Amino acid sequence: LPILVGTGSPRMLRLTARWAEEWNTWGDPDEVARRTERFTAACESVGREPGELRRSAQAMVFFTPTQAARDAVQAHVVPDRSLVGGAQELVDQLARYEELGVHEFAIADFTLGESPEERRDTYAALHADVLSAFR
């Protein structure tokens, strides 16, 4: 059974590098880039090739097709933990994760709408307008 560990502290990064098959982290692409540098150093410190481990990431995703929606959301997000934008902006941001060696990106539904129907509709739009670029 593969072990996935989501962590960022130096000690846990070393333990993850030594024992896990996948490392998970949170953040926007810039934050994940910083964390990836620390994870690579942890792998090297325990004698493990960083490319041997799968990597996954997650961030709060706010699909905001209009500038007004972006402006409303930007005032309330944690910048280094969030992706905010319309379709092309999200495609560009997600492509950066791919460049960083991330194999899988997790999207939590709590940022995609208040009701189940709104979340469903946002997921459908994300799939059609954003995620389809990665298939």
Predicted regions: what they are:
Residues 1-135:
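Active-site-adjacent structural elements that line small-molecule/cofactor binding pockets in enzymes
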